[in-house]
């Protein structure tokens, strides 16, 4: 039986107890230095000391910081983690932004939060000139704290107040600032601590020693990665940072990792390595955690049968990453997102939409009470926008997005995700999106030009298995991959408006 992980009461407890008292000599963060060869290890003792330095720096720079926003605009790095804790413990509101967005998007988000400071890595991602022109006096380097003195910490965090803002990906329009509290974080930490205990008790390979190390290529500005920054100190585990997908195999080879949070496309890459007999490239990686999109259950089953542990999860920024987890390694439930945790309530409403109620649910959308009221009802249920079903064993399955439903002239509702899943079974289809066009169902397909006839034949056969109202009546072939966001999610609005290379009426 694994020793129970003591969940911290908040961010202050995380630093002063978990980092400084319980695990000071454990490695907290690893990364590969600029020479591309040297692995830098930061232990929890040094991590906590740097957090204290950041608190000192911020209080000196902005004496009236309480309740004001400090923005992080940077690739994955150790200083990002230090700043995240430092901003909160200095009384500020942590804001993490995607540094690779267009200036129009960044200008909007920065205008929303009105930052007191912007900590950034100095890299030009395409709009450096505009950033300096608009916010030059507020810009600071990520390591701005390095010459400061470690200061005293006080527990200044309002447990139910605004602790951080994280913007949604905005796949269908302007992004929204999700307001999150320390209570939201702690609710999620309860779940993640139980996940860690489950790993230790039921998933650990023979001979595997603790503490574990977790590789992340996901961006720290995204909740799927950020939640690891907050959930690993209570267990004393390490986070191995990779800042660029081009360095993934180099970094994985230099830093042994047990677990990896991954976008679906990277899981497929790892599967291909396994199929080609190149498992040595993975350097002992054995646990894959995936969210954001459905994966082929046959692929997951094969990975699980050959020594990998595969965990799927369903969480949202609006719930601090908390949600539904799937630890099963058997084929009958591999396509499910899992079962709900025990710390929130879950249900399907009358339309089949997944709803969540509990301490992990956000405070609301920043400066947008109308949008908040649209997703959190009077009884406190957060309406996720995802449609689902529950099987007889209590497993949840995602069937589509409510806002993506196509309403046809005959009144029938059709889920594009259902048809996309069927099209994905065609070997020639690399990517696809289904849309409504002139009251007909149309598929946009990315594939090799010489395989377009194969796709057409597949759709013809597929249509024979579908009711008339669900049949695909047009296909567009595009020469370019479909647009996706930083986490690999399909951008449907842009995908629907692609200029197709060819249009074939079936």
Predicted features, each with a name:
Residues 1-61, 66, 85, 111, ...:
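N-lobe entry segment of adenylate-forming
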Residues 24-27, 149-167, 173-174, 203-213:
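Conserved pre-ATP/AMP-binding loop-to-beta segment of ANL
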Residues 40, 55-101:
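Conserved AMP-binding/adenylate-forming
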Residues 41-45, 163-190:
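Conserved AMP-binding A3 loop
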Residues 118, 358, 363-364, 387-470, ...:
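AMP-binding/adenylate-forming catalytic core of the ANL superfamily
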Residues 186-213, 220-284:
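Conserved AMP-binding/adenylation subdomain of ANL enzymes
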Residues 252, 258-262, 271-332, 345, ...:
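Gly/Ser/Thr-rich phosphate-binding loop
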Residues 339-342, 349-375, 395, 410-414:
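Conserved ATP/PPi-binding loop(s) of AMP-dependent carboxylate-activating enzymes
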């Amino acid at each position: 039986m694994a020793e129970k992980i003591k969940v911290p009461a908040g961010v202050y407890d995380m630093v002063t107890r978990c980092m400084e008292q319980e695990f000071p000599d454990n490695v907290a963060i690893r990364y590969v230095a600029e020479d591309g060869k040297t692995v830098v290890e930061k232990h929890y003792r040094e991590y906590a000391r740097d957090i204290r330095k950041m608190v000192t720096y911020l209080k000196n720079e902005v004496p009236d910081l309480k309740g004001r926003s400090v923005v992080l605009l940077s690739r994955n790095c150790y200083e990002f983690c230090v700043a995240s804790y430092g901003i909160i413990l200095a009384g500020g509101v942590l804001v993490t932004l995607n540094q690779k967005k267009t200036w129009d998007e960044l200008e909007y988000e920065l205008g929303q939060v009105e930052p007191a400071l912007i900590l950034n890595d100095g890299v030009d991602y395409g709009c450096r000139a505009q950033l300096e022109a608009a916010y030059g006096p507020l810009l600071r380097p990520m390591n701005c704290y390095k010459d400061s003195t470690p200061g005293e910490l006080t527990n200044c965090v309002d447990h139910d107040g605004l602790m951080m803002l994280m913007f949604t990906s905005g796949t269908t329009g302007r992004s929204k600032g999700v307001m999150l509290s320390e209570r939201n974080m702690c609710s999620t930490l309860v779940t993640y601590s139980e996940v860690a205990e489950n790993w230790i008790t039921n998933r650990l390979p023979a001979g595997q020693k603790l503490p574990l190390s977790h590789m992340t290529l996901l961006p720290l500005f995204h909740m799927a990665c950020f939640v690891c920054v907050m959930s690993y100190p209570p267990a004393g585990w390490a986070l191995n940072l990779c800042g660029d997908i081009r360095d993934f195999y180099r970094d994985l080879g230099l830093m042994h990792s047990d677990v990896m949070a991954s976008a679906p496309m990277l899981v497929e890459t790892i599967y291909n390595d396994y199929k080609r007999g190149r498992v040595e490239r993975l350097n002992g990686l054995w646990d894959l955690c995936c969210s954001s999109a459905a994966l082929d259950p046959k692929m997951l089953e094969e990975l699980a049968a050959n020594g990998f542990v595969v965990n799927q999860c369903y969480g949202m920024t609006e719930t601090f990453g908390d949600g539904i987890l799937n630890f099963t390694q058997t084929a009958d439930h591999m396509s499910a997102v899992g079962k709900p945790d025990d710390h929130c309530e879950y249900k399907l409403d009358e339309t089949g939409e997944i709803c969540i109620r509990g301490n992990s649910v956000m405070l609301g959308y920043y400066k947008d009470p109308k949008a908040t009221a649209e997703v959190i009802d009077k009884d406190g249920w957060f309406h996720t926008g995802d449609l689902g079903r529950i099987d007889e064993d209590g497993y949840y399955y995602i069937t589509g997005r409510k806002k993506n439903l196509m309403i046809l002239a005959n009144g029938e509702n059709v889920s594009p995700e259902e048809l996309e899943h069927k099209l994905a079974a065609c070997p020639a289809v690399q990517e696809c999106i289904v849309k409504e066009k002139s009251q007909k169902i149309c598929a946009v397909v990315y594939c090799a030009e010489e395989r377009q006839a194969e796709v057409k034949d597949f759709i013809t056969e597929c249509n024979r298995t579908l009711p008339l109202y669900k049949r695909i009546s047009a296909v567009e072939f595009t020469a370019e991959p479909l647009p996706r966001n930083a986490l690999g999610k399909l951008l449907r609005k842009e995908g629907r408006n692609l200029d197709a290379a060819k249009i074939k009426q079936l």
